[in-house]
Every structure is written in C-alpha cells, then in structure tokens.
C-alpha cells in the first residue's frame, strides 16, 4: 500500500502532512520564480526577444550572473527533484522525478561547462523556469489533492477535544484522549459525544448525520448506543464509555477511508506500469532526439534543447495522478453519506455491477414483526387496538410487541388488563374493562369455542399471502383479524426502482417461505425471487449468477450472510452502525437504508468515469506532445517548444487531471423519497 506521498512521487516528504508538503512546495516555487525573472531578463531571450538592455551588475558577464542566480534555484528549489530521483533509482524504478532531474541537470550542467570555458550559448533560464513551472504545478496539484481529502479532515474534526467525566460524584473536564472504557460521561445538550458510549441515564435526540449520513435526529434512551462525534441535541445524557481511541467507530471510519484512498484500483496498476515505460521512453527518446539533430547538422545547444523538451513533456505525472485523485474524491464522497469503500478495487467493482442480490430480512425489510393489515367487524379500530394491546402488554412474544406498537402508534388510550392467561403456542386471554378478550391464532379460538364465521375466508387469504394472522375476539365473538409480517423499509421500494433505473437487475434472496417472499417482492417491484434458501446455500446462488457471466453484488447484514458477501464480486454490508470493520464486506453501509446501495454504485460509476477520462487525457496528451517536442515540425512549420513551455504544458496537464477529479464533488446522487407501506385498515 502506497502513501499519498509515494503516489505523488514525493517520498522525501514522507514525514510531512499534505498541508506541510504544499507549503514546502510553495516556498520552493517562490524562490525559483523570483530568481528566474532576472535570469530570464539577462538571457539570450531577454536580450533578443524582450530587448532588455541593462548590463549585468558588478561588471559580470551575463552568463556568470545567471550562474550565480541559478545556484539557489538548483540547490534549494530543485533539490527535491534530485533527491526524489536518487530514491527512485535506489528502488530500481523510474518516475517523473527522474525525468525532471535529468532535464534540469542536463541544461544547467551544459550551461555551467560553457560558462567555465569562457562563455557562449547558455540556457540557465530553461533550467530555472522549468524548475519553477514544475514546482508550481506540484504546489497547485497538492492543494487540489488536499481538497480531495476534505472528507477525512472533516471526520477527524468531529471528535471534541474535551470530555466531561463524572468521577467521585464531581464533573471533571479531561482531554478526550484520556477517556477510559467504563468512564461515566456527562453529555449536555448541544455537546458532541466524545467517544462511543451506552446511555445509562436520560433521554434525548442525537444528530448522527455527520457520522452516518442519517438526516433525522435519532431518539436515545437508557441502553442505546451513542456514536462518538455525534451531537446531543436536546436532553442531558449520562453514558458509559464503551470504545475509546482507535477503537471508536469514528476512528475506524477514518482508518477505512484512508486505507481506501491509498490503495490501488486494478486500472491504476496498469497506469503505474505504463508510467514506468513512459519514463524509459522519454529518456531513450530524449537521447535519440539529441543524436538525430546532431546528425542533421544542428549545434549541440540546439540539439540538447530539443532533447530536454522531449524529456520534460513526456513526464508521466498526469498518468500517475489519473486514478488516485479520483479514488480520493470518490471515497470521501461515500464517507460523507455513510458509505465506506474498503479499497479502490471496491469502487471499480461497484461500477461494473450488473445484478444486486439483496437479503430480505433486515435489508429490504425492518427485521421485526409489524401489524401491516387490520380487518375489523362490528367494532371501531381504536377499540380493537385498545383491547388487544391491553392483553398483549404483559406478554414478551414478538407478535405481542408488534400489536402494542401499533396501538401506541395510533395513540389509543391505554387500558388495564386483569386475569391475564398466557397460552403458549396459542395466544393470550385477559379481562379488560368488563370484557373477556382473546388474542391469538385459530387454535386459540377453537379452544375457546369461538367460531370465526365470515372471518374464516379472510383469515385463510391473509395466511396464503405469507402473513401471520392474529384473531381478536371479545366476549366470545370475533371482532378483528390482524395480519402481522416483517414490513418493508420505508426506502426499500424506491431503492429497488433506483437500481433498476441504473440498469441493474435486483434479486431477493431469503430463507423465508415462498409465499411471504413473493408478497414482499410484489410490493417492492422485484421480479426475481430466490426463496427457502438455507444460509449455507446462499453463496452457491451467487456463484450461479457469476457462472452466467453476471457481475454480482450481495447485500446483507455482514454476519449471517458472510459466505455470500465473500463470494460476490462486491460484498455490501448494510446497517453496520458502529461495527464498521466487517471483514467480509467490500463496502460497508453504516445506515440500514437499502437506497445507499444505489448511491454506492452511482459513486462507483462516476469515479470510474473520471478515472477513464483522466487516463484518456494523459495518454492522448503524450501522444500529441512528444512529436511536437522532438522538433519534427520545426523544419517545415517552424513549430518549436522550449523546455519552459513544455514544463508549463506538463504542469497544466497534471493540474487538469486533478481538477477534473475534484469535479466529482459536484456529484449529487439521487435522494430517496420514502414510500413506506402503510398498514391497511379494512372494515
């Protein structure tokens, strides 16, 4: 894995931050630029083209004065290129540092020899202006790459520097870095949560958008988890620290983003190999250019200028920047939305996905039972819910909890139940407000000698659609049927539609019975369903799609679906929350929002598109520039590039690549408009 310094060819900057590197490059550029002005004025160009007539100071010859002024440029400003070239050669490789060092050294050394031999045609200005332009390009390039890394910087700034810890009953403000697991934290309204913690006392709403991308505040109560870096909005919380330092979710997110940004995409590996050979071509091409012009009868000074221009303009800097800059922006874009790409290959693979296989429970659905249909006979819905909830409030069964939640959601008045009787496998009975209420399945009704009458057909139809049917009877008379199922997530339908609009096939994979799976699939618009699949067989189903020539992504919870996630071309773990380090996933979605799958693929495609644009520009630029630089158009058209112009062109090309990648920041993936499936009420 290469660091950003290595990606840019600046191993000598390895101990510096990106900002410090940019400042260092700026200082070197300013020295080179300021001194290059008088060097240019007292050069042949200044005398003959600019008609500058002032004599050199102290009675010195023009070339001697230029030599003196060039020493700081070569010794300080340009030293970074010589140092980088030595490092590259020691590593037995060739990079842009080698090319720039050769070009600067060749022109400057030739000029020094001419000066020491009594004077003649020199071009110190070519070496110093070349140095200045390359440094300018790198300075601007680093600033652009620094902008690409804004996402990581923003994440690092989320953690507050101080935390309030309660010790021996007293509130103590300590640096966040000193908080220990188990410490009792006091989190006031408006304050940031310093580390991952669990609420011990108090209720509040917490804004987790800066970490997870979740736009709405999340209600927190005792026992709920808090993410370090999130913002407590309205209530005072006391919480126990659960993870600190590098173990926090925020630290893990930053680590994943940084690892992804410094990893190589498959396309980048090809670009790196091409860059190596391009350097070799430049060195050989420069040598052949020198020899060719000498054989053509030109002077050595003219021939070496052409050779230096070829070496400079062939510099593969743009080729080396083409993919890593786009990767940095793409991963940062995902991180802001709670989408974590594990590596550069994951971005490229996401862009090529043709079919998305989604686990049903917990991915497309909420993963918990919910009353999705209510059919009443002879009694208002509010009364039915009030009576049923009164009976089920004392039960711990998941179906009972679903009925209580539906009653609370409808804001019905709470009633008390007495003589509660739980009948395992059947349901429950109780007395509520003078009525005998039975809530359970058909077997409970038969046990209590309650005839379903007209509700029998409706109950069978609901069961055939895969719902669990609960009957409510009051005083021996059935008054309602409740269809309970695992309801789709609010954004599940629009998530499927978004994927289909991207031209991607969506497949539901589940261990549930086919009737239940097909009902959910119909609601969401999914055309292909793989039902009644054992967990151990899910990976095999993914392999079948791959054998059919499809690039498949698997979306699951990262635990039960681990083998399938590993088998897929892209494994996407959804709903990771604070557990972002899921080993089998290539992409981690912090939120439990299936729409983020479409967003991740959109980001992947946009990033790959930028990578291809940048590579196309870098290759095309060299294909056009090298013949011009070699001077083959000079005899007929008089078209000549000087090394300084070549340096400006090369730097501009690199900057264009970096800026093009930064345009990714303007990408606005479609936002979902939740279309929750409302519970049906029929009377």
Question: Residue spans of the language-model regions?
Answer:
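Transmembrane helix-loop-helix hairpins at the membrane interface
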Residues: 18-162, 273, 277-281, 302, ...
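Conserved cytosolic catalytic loops of P-type ATPases
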Residues: 154-247, 344-388, 431
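Membrane-embedded alpha-helical bundles of multi-pass transporters
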Residues: 31, 41, 48-64, 90, ...
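Flexible metal-binding regulatory segments at protein termini and peripheral loops
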Residues: 1-62, 75, 154, 169-173, ...
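Conserved ATP-binding TGD loop and adjacent catalytic N/P-domain core of P-type ATPases
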Residues: 189, 243, 263, 341, ...
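Conserved catalytic phosphorylation-site environment of P-type ATPases
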Residues: 161, 211, 270, 305, ...
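Juxtamembrane coupling segments of multi-pass membrane pumps/enzymes
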Residues: 126-189, 220, 269-270, 340-341, ...
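ATP-driven catalytic headpiece of P-type ATPases
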Residues: 25-27, 230, 354-396, 426-507, ...
């Amino acid at each position: 894995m290469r660091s950003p310094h290595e990606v840019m060819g600046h191993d000598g900057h390895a101990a510096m931050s990106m900002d410090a590197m940019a400042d260092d490059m700026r200082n070197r550029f300013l020295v080179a630029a300021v001194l290059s002005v008088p060097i240019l004025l007292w050069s042949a160009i200044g005398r003959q083209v600019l008609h500058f007539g002032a004599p050199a100071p102290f009675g010195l010859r023009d070339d001697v004065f230029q030599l003196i002024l060039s020493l700081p440029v070569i010794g300080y400003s340009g030293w970074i290129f010589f140092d980088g070239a030595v490092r590259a050669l020691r590593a037995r490789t060739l990079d842009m540092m080698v090319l720039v060092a050769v070009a600067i050294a060749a022109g400057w050394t030739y000029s020094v020899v001419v000066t020491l031999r009594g004077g003649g045609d020199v071009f110190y200005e070519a070496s110093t202006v070349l140095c200045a332009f390359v440094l300018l390009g790198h300075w601007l390039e680093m600033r652009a790459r620094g902008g690409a890394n804004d996402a990581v910087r923003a994440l690092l700034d989320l953690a507050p520097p101080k935390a309030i810890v309660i010790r021996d009953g007293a509130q103590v403000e300590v640096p966040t870095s000193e908080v220990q697991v188990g410490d009792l934290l006091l989190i006031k309204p408006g304050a940031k949560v310093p580390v991952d913690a669990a609420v011990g006392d108090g209720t509040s709403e917490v804004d987790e958008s800066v970490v997870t991308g979740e736009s709405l505040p999340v209600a927190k109560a005792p026992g709920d988890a808090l993410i370090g870096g999130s913002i407590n909005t309205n209530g005072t919380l006391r919480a126990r620290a659960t993870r600190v330092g590098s173990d926090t979710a925020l630290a893990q997110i930053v680590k994943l983003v940084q690892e992804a940004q410094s990893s190589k995409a498959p396309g980048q590996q090809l670009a790196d190999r091409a860059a190596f050979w391009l350097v070799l071509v430049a060195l050989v091409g420069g040598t052949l250019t020198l020899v060719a012009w000498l054989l053509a009868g030109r002077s050595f000074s003219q021939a070496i200028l052409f050779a230096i221009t070829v070496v400079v303009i062939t510099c593969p800097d743009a080729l080396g920047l083409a993919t890593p800059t786009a990767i940095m922006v793409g991963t940062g874009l995902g991180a802001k939305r709670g989408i974590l790409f594990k590596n550069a290959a994951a971005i490229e693979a996401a862009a090529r996905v043709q079919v998305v296989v989604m686990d049903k429970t917990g991915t497309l659905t909420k993963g918990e039972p919910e009353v999705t249909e209510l059919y009443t006979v002879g009694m208002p819905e509010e009364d039915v819910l009030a009576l049923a909830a009164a009976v089920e409030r004392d039960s711990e069964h998941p179906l009972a909890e679903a009925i209580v939640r539906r009653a609370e959601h409808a804001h019905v008045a709470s009633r008390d139940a007495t003589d509660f009787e739980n009948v395992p496998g059947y349901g429950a009975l109780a007395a509520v407000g003078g009525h005998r209420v039975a809530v359970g399945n058909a077997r409970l009704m038969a046990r209590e000698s309650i005839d379903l009458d007209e509700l029998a057909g409706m109950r069978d139809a609901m069961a055939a659609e895969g719902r669990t049917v609960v009957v409510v009877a009051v005083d021996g008379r059935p008054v309602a049927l409740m269809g309970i199922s695992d309801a789709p997530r609010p954004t599940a339908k629009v998530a499927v539609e978004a994927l289909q609009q991207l031209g991607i096939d969506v497949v539901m994979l589940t261990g549930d019975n086919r009737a239940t799976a097909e009902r959910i699939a119909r609601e969401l618009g999914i055309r292909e369903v793989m039902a009644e699949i054992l967990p151990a067989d899910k990976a095999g189903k993914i392999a079948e799609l791959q054998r059919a020539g499809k690039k498949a992504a698997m979306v699951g919870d990262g635990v039960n679906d681990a083998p399938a996630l590993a088998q897929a071309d892209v494994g996407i773990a959804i709903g990771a929350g604070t557990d972002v380090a899921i080993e089998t996933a290539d992409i981690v979605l912090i939120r439990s929002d299936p729409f983020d799958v479409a967003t991740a693929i959109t980001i992947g495609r946009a990033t790959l598109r930028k990578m291809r644009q940048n590579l196309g520009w870098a290759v095309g630029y060299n294909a056009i520039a090298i013949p011009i630089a070699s001077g083959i158009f000079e005899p007929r058209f008089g078209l000549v590039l000087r090394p300084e112009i070549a340096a400006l062109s090369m730097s501009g090309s690199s900057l264009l690549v970096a800026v093009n990648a930064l345009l990714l920041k303007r990408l606005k993936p479609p936002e979902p408009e939740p279309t929750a499936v409302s519970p049906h009420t029929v009377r």
